[in-house]
Structure formats: C-alpha cells, structure tokens
C-alpha cells in the first residue's frame, strides 16, 4: 500500500478566531522604543549588553536600546538618532561599538526568554519541553546584497538566513545566522544544546529541511525525541531494526535494515560524539 497522511484540520472555532480579532483591535498603539524600555523594566535584558573591556552594564540605557533598535531595523546610528529625541548618533554608535556583540545579544535574548518562561501565563501554551525549529530567509538590499548569497528555492534575489528554535511557550531559545545555501539539518542540534536559556527541551519538531539520517540517529543517542514533518512521505523509505515483515502494511516503505553490527563496532566513538 501507499502511505498517506491526511493533514490535520484546524481546531480553532470560528467564534474563537473572531474573538481574537476583536481583542487584538483593543490593543493600544505603542511606539517600539517605549516597548523596548518597558520590556527592559520587566526583564533587565539591557544589562546583558556588558562593556567589552570592563564587563559593566551600560549606563545609558536609552542609547543602548536605540542601538538595539538601529541594528534590528538596519537604520544605523545617524538615521536612528534623527528619529529619536535626546539621543545622538555618537551615543548610539558608542553603545554599539562597546556593548553590542554577538555574545551580549545572545545573553539578552536568553534573559527575555527566561523571564517569559517563568511567567505563569506561559504555562497556558505548554511546559517548555517541546519546541520547533525552522529557517527564515530575509532578502537583502542595497549594499547588503553584495555580501549575501542566493538560494533559488527563495528566488533569484540575494539574502541572509536565520535558523531559529521556538519553544511551545513561544519563547526563542536559539537564533543562528546561517548561509542560505547550507542545509538546516546541520544546525538542529547546535540550537538545541548550545543555548543559554533555562528551557529543557525533550522533543523537537522540524520540517523536511531540518532532517537527515544523522539527526535521526543522534537524537536516539542523546535520549531526545525527533518529530519531523516530512514532505513527500509516500516516496520515502524507513529503516528499522526489525525484519521487514514486522510492518506488513508498510512493506512498500521499508528500506534496508539498520546495520546493528556496524553500530556496535563503533559504539564507543558514537557515545563520545553524542
């Protein structure tokens, strides 16, 4: 037979969607700088942007937040200073030069995610042990286009790609910049283990781009559950430890048996790798 997986139907009632839209319209309009300041007051994330030499937290929080916003919008210090009051381009540039680094952005992101994880409302969506990861492509323009790569899957325009991990509580635990031409599967385990949040993820969902035989095998070794959403599953072969007749209904989808002798021969090396 042929394996056919029927997509799940939406379980959101129409009334709930209408209520969501109604509530969304009640949200007040907030300026992004004000929102960043409020999030900092809740979490203290701006203190994670420590000085490159002294390790001190930034003294001018407003300039630091303006620098974060300048990075996030690609406006740069001059245009950002022109859009804000009381902050100069020099102040923003100084903060970016001495406080904004990849490791401080990572620490700030973890600070926000941890505060989100500890908030009792986050338990409504999940307990933080399940997550999903996926790549996002962002088209480049102007000068950035000359330093970017092209992946025809996303069209003929150059751009950059970020591989992000999101918990079931909707908190990011990992955001990795990668080349648009690279396989996403290489970064699945990097994001899962190399992060600074308090999340303890036991099950990970990915799309087809995040899967490979190596990822399947390593998840078994590390005791985590890998749950990919595979494209064209009817054309795929599954490799099992049992004999092929153990799954008669899936006979057309069972490939070569797993070579257990080869696994045992290299068991110690596999454990060191995991």
Question: What residue spans do the PLM features occupy?
Answer:
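Catalytic or ion-translocation cores adjacent to nucleophile or general acid/base/metal-coordination motifs
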Residues: 82-120, 151-268
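Structured, charged N-terminal subsegments at the starts of enzyme catalytic cores
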Residues: 1-83
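A generic structural signal for ordered alpha-helices
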Residues: 10-17, 51, 58-59, 70, ...
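Structured nucleic-acid-interacting core domains from mobile-element enzymes and related host factors
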Residues: 110-149
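Charge-patterned, long linear interaction tracts outside catalytic cores
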Residues: 271-274
């Amino acid at each position: 037979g042929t394996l056919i997986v029927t997509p799940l139907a939406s379980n959101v009632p129409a009334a709930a969607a209408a209520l969501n839209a109604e509530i969304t319209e009640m949200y007040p309009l907030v300026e992004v700088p004000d929102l960043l300041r409020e999030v900092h007051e809740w979490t203290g994330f701006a203190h994670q942007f420590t000085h490159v030499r002294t390790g001190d937290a930034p003294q001018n929080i407003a300039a630091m937040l303006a620098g974060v916003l300048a990075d996030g919008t690609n406006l740069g210090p001059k245009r950002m200073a022109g859009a804000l009051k009381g902050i100069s381009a020099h102040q923003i540039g100084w903060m970016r030069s001495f406080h904004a680094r990849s490791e401080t952005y990572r620490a700030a992101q973890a600070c926000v995610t941890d505060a989100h994880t500890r908030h009792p409302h986050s338990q409504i969506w999940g307990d933080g042990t399940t997550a999903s990861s996926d790549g996002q492509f962002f088209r480049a323009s102007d000068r950035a286009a000359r330093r970017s790569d092209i992946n025809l899957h996303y069209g003929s325009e150059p751009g950059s790609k970020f591989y992000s991990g999101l918990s079931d509580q909707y908190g990011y635990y990992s955001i990795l910049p990668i080349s648009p031409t690279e396989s996403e599967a290489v970064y699945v385990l990097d994001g899962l283990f190399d992060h600074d949040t308090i999340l303890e993820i036991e099950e990970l969902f990915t799309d087809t781009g995040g899967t490979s035989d190596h990822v399947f095998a390593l998840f078994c070794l590390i005791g985590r559950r890998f749950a990919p959403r595979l494209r064209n599953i009817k054309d795929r072969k599954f490799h099992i430890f049992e004999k092929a007749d153990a799954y008669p209904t899936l006979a057309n989808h069972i490939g070569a048996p797993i070579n257990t002798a080869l696994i045992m021969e290299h068991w110690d090396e596999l454990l060191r790798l995991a």
